[in-house]
Regions:
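Feature captures the catalytic ectodomains and active-site-proximal regions of enzymes
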Residues: 1-543
Length: 543
């Protein structure tokens, strides 16, 4: 299909620019004390939520390509849908299909993994031990393990990264105990050697992203490969000890640990001749550890010699750098994003966020492709994120992003801009209500200032989010006790158009099923173009 756009006959956009403001983690939750957005003072958002040009969008489950409507949305699939204008099957759904059909085990890649085992090597599975279904799902690991048993693989090690973010913040034992018992039972009943070898919390070990802190990856490398870390007899002992030593400790922040035998030796360091499978399906926190396992020339930390191993990811985590080189499940093939159409039309645009969400407004927005579509038309700006836990600095870089956006707008060079405020999501993940309120109020203030500039420039702003998080900071258990909630929510997200020049040229369509994929056509309409034929329909109807 050609990348051509047709102009609307009745609406040609406004004199000024179109600005898309993505408030990461800002959903439409219950109006009660669990909702940081409701509790916070947000005069600007309050006005938007009451305006005539306001609606709500689905941002989870099947609306963003995930298997069921019980699945939380996330920033990756959210920005894919926003930028692509259509819904594509995403990581978990693709992996489910490959595992259920057995297709994954008929690939040459799986054959190469098994060859290592048949020659005496160990198969290592590294990944997030969780059913959060955001980065991974423990069911996928269980199917992989069961197939190894059926295939007679003699030695398997699991390197268990603890979640506490997309699931309960102190829920690690709900996953570690069954996994420990499963591997022990396999070893006893089948005469095989299966067990947990190492682990640690996802925010301390292995799962860094966007080059924010390579020390996290280094700690993972040392635990998984070198067998260096705090020693324990079992992973259960490790978790229980961390809890006992610090009653405030949550799973995602646990340090690296290594399981040792009766002689104090690590039971499963990765050695020459082994195979390694990183079983997370989401890419952002899988790229760096994949680089460490595959790049011969590597300088991010003192890695030492690269072991002679075969490494495969569950999926290709970066389609442009082809990282990792070998993977088990093909990613969605996303084509014809809105930015490709706008570049073809010669529309100048910018994208900006801080490090934590920079990849979302660029790579994921562009259909999982790195770099510029047309460097002569696009400007990408990354504001370095703070290297602290975000409840300690809940304002993050929102003010700096806002200031840079205003600077870019006032050059009068850009017809379209997009930005992401990370606060609602990153601070929401800490489960600190006090910090989340500050985060939300900061975003509200920044949105207000941007709307003032858009008004001055006679432009249009669209304010939305990619998924919820800060809208549900805790739940209430049966005993009436508050349980901190660090995960994303299943709530819809806001969508508001701020058009100071509005004279009734269009109205909200209010469709029965509307989600993030409807935004791209809406943006095209607001720029004066018809929607693309096979994009999900616009959220506005021209009069």
């Amino acid at each position: 299909m050609p990348l051509t756009l047709r102009k609307l006959k009745t609406f040609h956009g406004r004199k000024g620019p179109l600005l898309l403001i993505i408030m990461d983690g800002i959903g439409m939750g219950r109006q009660d004390e669990s909702n940081a957005i409701y509790v916070a003072k947000t005069p600007n958002l309050d006005r938007l939520f009451q305006s005539d040009l306001f609606t709500q969008l689905k941002a989870h489950g099947t609306a963003v390509g995930l298997p069921t409507d019980k699945d939380m949305g996330n920033s990756e699939v959210g920005h894919n849908a926003l930028g692509a204008g259509r819904v594509f099957d995403q990581g978990a759904r693709l992996v489910n299909k490959a595992l259920e059909s057995g297709k994954i085990f008929r690939t040459d890649i799986w054959g190469d993994i098994e060859k290592r085992a048949m020659l005496g090597g160990t198969i290592h599975f590294i990944g997030l031990l969780s059913d959060g279904n955001v980065h991974s799902h423990i069911d996928h690991l269980n199917i992989l393990l069961d197939h190894c048993v059926e295939s007679g693989i003699k030695r398997v090690r699991v390197h268990a990264l603890l979640d506490g973010r997309d699931v309960g913040e102190r829920s690690a034992l709900d996953y570690v105990i069954p996994m420990h018992e499963k591997l022990k039972r396999i070893s006893r009943e089948k005469g095989l050697d299966y067990g947990i070898a190492s682990g640690g919390g996802r925010m301390k070990v292995t799962m860094d992203r966007y080059n924010a802190d390579w020390e996290i990856v280094k700690r993972g490398w040392e635990a998984h490969v070198l067998g260096k870390g705090r020693p324990f007899k079992t992973a259960i002992d490790a978790v229980e000890t961390f809890y006992a030593e610090d009653p405030k400790m949550t799973d995602q922040y646990m340090g690296p640990f290594v399981i040792t035998d009766d002689q104090g030796q690590p039971v499963g360091p990765i050695r020459d001749g082994d195979a390694v499978v990183f079983f997370n399906f989401r890419g952002d926190r899988a790229i760096e550890i994949s680089r460490a396992f595959t790049e011969k020339v590597f300088s991010e930390f003192l890695r030492g010699p690269l072991p002679d191993i075969f490494f495969a990811g569950m999926m290709e985590y970066d389609g442009d750098t082809h990282m990792p080189p070998y993977f088990l499940v093909q990613p969605p093939d996303i084509d014809r994003t809105i930015s490709e159409y706008l570049c073809e039309e010669g529309v100048k645009m910018f994208a900006i966020s801080e490090t934590q969400k920079y990849g979302h407004v660029t790579y994921f927005w562009n259909g999982n492709r790195s770099g510029y579509i047309d460097e002569t038309l696009e400007t990408y700006v990354e504001i370095p994120s703070d290297r602290v836990e975000f409840d300690q600095a809940p304002k993050m870089k929102a003010v700096e992003i806002k200031d840079k956006v205003i600077e870019l707008l006032r050059t009068n060079q850009y017809r379209f801009g997009r930005l992401n405020f990370a606060n609602g999501d990153m601070v929401g993940h800490t489960a600190s209500m006090e910090a989340a309120i500050i985060a939300v109020e900061t975003v509200d203030q920044c949105v207000g200032e941007l709307l003032t500039v858009i008004n001055e420039m006679e432009g249009i702003a669209v304010v939305t989010a990619d998924h919820g998080n800060a809208d549900e900071m805790f739940t209430i258990d049966k005993a009436g006790k508050k349980k901190p909630k660090t995960a994303h929510t299943l709530n819809p997200v806001p969508f508001a158009i701020v058009d100071p020049g509005y004279q009734g040229e269009y109205r909200m369509a209010h469709m029965e099923k509307q989600g993030l994929a409807n935004v791209a056509s809406t943006l095209l309409n607001l720029l004066g173009y018809e929607g693309v034929e096979d994009y999900d329909p616009s959220l506005i109807t021209m009069r």
